[in-house]
């Protein structure tokens, strides 16, 4: 078969396979067009689950007569004009494929009128390559799109449609998702001439909350926590459910990026990680989250349905969302009231940048959205950014390099009985510790027991060393160094304290400083902001640890340090080399004064009881 260009109608039907999955896909694309046209009231009429008729009517700016024939052409759009526009998508639609794809698999009628025209005009297409004719019509300012007999010319696609009830349920869900993102727009939904939903325009905060309660349920709003978290050009807002009211189905999660509903693994993982210590595998969080960021930092041109996005700095977005979620969940647990801006006009805002308001004068794009984001500072270099993740899932210490693992392997020796392989710590790693430097008193690491303890041998004595105790001891040693390695947080952590916690903070501020923490304090608002933390604690739930320390004041630094280490959580070690690596790292920080504390961690194994059983 020779290579040839596909006929336009066939090409459109192939494109429709990606854009038009089911009637709900048509509804989504048409409503997004209405929103981009600046509509404030959208009517959606459905018949037989959308298979027979989908009618979307809006009061947007309309389409001029001489542009109607272009509206149904492929890759024709008023929303972008250059590559620069593509890199900063402000509208919901931009590909110029929706109407062409829909018209190729249905009988489509488009009627529109602009404010500059005295009469409306109508164009019709019915799934085949033909010249469209424009005829006069009666219509108010705005646009109406009728999609009849969906998939009438592709029987295989129509065969895969589900029942009318199921297809309408998908349409209803699409409208719910859009209505949450656009509270200022009124929506009316009917099915088979029966009114299903009427969402009135919501302008005030009370009206917006009422719309969310209408869509998500009163139970959600009554048990939800409000989020308003900012950092430079990043802004996270919305509502998240309290952990104790988690759901058993993953059916109430709505996430939007710059007003666009999305499904993204980075966001999902950050949210799930924030809830990880509260929920089990059979529980799911519920949330309505709005993420605003510089359009240059997110690529929405990933898939024709525009559900998927790609972040240029995924780790930054992940940690920003995680910290915002964790802050909200932790604040609720400490009974910190969430006040509105009106009730607390002098409140101190979270660290944030100055947003620059600019608009575009490109016809339809002016109604599609505004660029509310300032340009990145010139001295900001993504590639040379010093940012490193300080909250990660399934974190484990860096595994030894192959050369180190080889060195460990060479240290494995076999006893005369050839029953137990032992590993001796290299001399260059052990010269500081008295318990190892003594001749003939060398500790041998023999094995990792159930991933919980190291089996050690010293002459004819055997000991168990708890991995968890060793991990805590390792951190304790690092926090007692004269120069504690610190990591500057790209997103400072803001903590709101109650009166008792703030008094505790004043008593223990020096202890935090000794441990490598760097805070700025706002005494008037009882707030502290963590700017730097010990690098050894970068994977910990640091907000939880700090609040725990403030809930229980400590008079001495040693007691404070013990309480801090008791709150640490570590991943389990799964290999012998990881355990030996941890022991080596701990030993490198040793001094003579630490020997008694280390010796207290060793549990001597008494063999007499077991040997007696062998007789």
From Swiss-Prot:
Homology family: Belongs to the DNA mismatch repair MutL/HexB family.
Q: Does the keyword Isomerase apply?
A: no
Task: Establish whether keyword DNA repair is in the entry.
Answer: yes
- What the protein does? This protein is involved in the repair of mismatches in DNA. It is required for dam-dependent methyl-directed DNA mismatch repair. May act as a 'molecular matchmaker', a protein that promotes the formation of a stable complex between two or more DNA-binding proteins in an ATP-dependent manner without itself being part of a final effector complex.
Give the disulfide map: none
Listed InterPro entries: DNA_mismatch_repair_CS, DNA_mismatch_repair_MutL, DNA_mismatch_S5_2-like, HATPase_C_sf, MutL/Mlh/PMS, MutL/Mlh/Pms-like, MutL_C, MutL_C_dimsub
Task: Give the GO biological process terms.
Answer: mismatch repair
Q: Output the SUPFAM superfamilies linked to this UniProt entry.
A: ATPase domain of HSP90 chaperone/DNA topoisomerase II/histidine kinase, DNA mismatch repair protein MutL, Ribosomal protein S5 domain 2-like
Q: Where are the transmembrane segments?
A: none
Protein origin, superkingdom: Bacteria
Keywords in UniProt for this one? Answer: DNA damage, DNA repair
The gene for this chain is mutL
One GO cellular component term: mismatch repair complex
Q: Name one GO molecular function term.
A: ATP hydrolysis activity
Return the protein name.
DNA mismatch repair protein MutL
